[in-house]
């Protein structure tokens, strides 16, 4: 059970999530089957725009496969992570809905490690709903920020709402290419290009691009990343700091 209260891109939400799951780890694949319940209040502060309360009771299944040689400094390997879920019609839910989301990444380092590491990442998701306004925003998608499309503020890519807010959308697509080149034993430089969008469907998407460079410090505790990126859409330069590897 978890309770989360947050305001991001001028969207305020309070969400309670609980459920029961059966977890199984077999042949390196972690799978989960369960029943989840989400209830959420959403509004845009200082406006009359109140999305009210929505809730969803969903049967969910998720799979995760991770085959990375060294997690503290990934050089070769891949990860796959997917989740699907659906309500039983509108039973204990604001509306009938189904959701699918997945992310994946691939790391490749040539035998001559001085060449560096090439990384490809991707994310995709979609929510089908009978009544779109009744879907909890926690189940929909926004993107932008250090873990998705760099060069943009956190969750700033989505549907434009009132008072400068950014509201979540039903479809998500994100891709990233990165090259890391060694500087010292524990330090690497990086160049990258990210792209992505969140829209009502995939046909309506207009990819937002971000290009930049950064530094990676592979400490004994966790990797530390500092990036500077240019957001092509709004023509601004932003910096990002993150701790840990993006799995």
What are these regions (language model features)?
Residues 1-81, 150-151, 155-162, 166, ...:
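Gram-negative/organellar outer-membrane beta-barrel architecture
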Residues 41-183, 192-195, 199:
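C-terminal outer-membrane beta-barrel translocator/porin domains of Gram-negative envelope proteins
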Residues 122-128, 145, 206, 218-247:
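Predominantly the C-terminal beta-signal and adjacent terminal strand-loop region
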Residues 181, 197-199, 215-223:
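Short leucine-rich amphipathic alpha-helical surface patches
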Residues 187-189:
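Structured catalytic core of nucleotide-sugar glycosyltransferases
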């Amino acid at each position: 059970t978890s309770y989360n209260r947050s305001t991001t891109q001028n969207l305020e939400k309070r969400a309670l999530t609980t459920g029961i799951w059966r977890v199984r780890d077999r042949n390196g694949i972690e799978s989960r089957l369960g029943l989840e319940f989400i209830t959420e209040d959403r509004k845009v502060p200082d406006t009359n725009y109140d999305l009210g309360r929505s809730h969803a009771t969903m049967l969910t299944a998720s799979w995760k496969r991770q085959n990375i040689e060294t997690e503290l400094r990934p050089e070769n390997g891949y990860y796959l992570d997917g989740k699907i879920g659906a309500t039983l019609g509108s039973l204990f839910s604001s509306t009938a809905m189904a959701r699918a989301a997945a992310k994946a990444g691939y790391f490749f380092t040539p035998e001559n490690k001085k060449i560096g590491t090439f990384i490809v990442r991707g994310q995709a998701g979609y929510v089908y709903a009978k009544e779109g306004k009744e879907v909890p925003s926690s189940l929909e998608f926004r993107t932008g920020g250090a873990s998705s499309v760099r060069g943009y503020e956190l969750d700033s890519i989505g549907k434009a709402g009132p008072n400068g807010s950014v509201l979540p959308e039903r479809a998500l697509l994100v891709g990233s290419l990165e090259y890391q080149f060694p500087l010292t034993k524990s330090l690497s430089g990086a160049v990258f290009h990210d792209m992505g969008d969140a829209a009502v469907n995939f046909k309506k998407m207009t990819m937002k691009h971000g290009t930049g460079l950064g530094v990676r410090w592979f400490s004994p505790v966790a990797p530390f990343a500092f990036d500077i990126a240019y957001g092509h859409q709004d023509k601004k330069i932003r910096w990002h700091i993150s701790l840990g590897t993006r799995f």
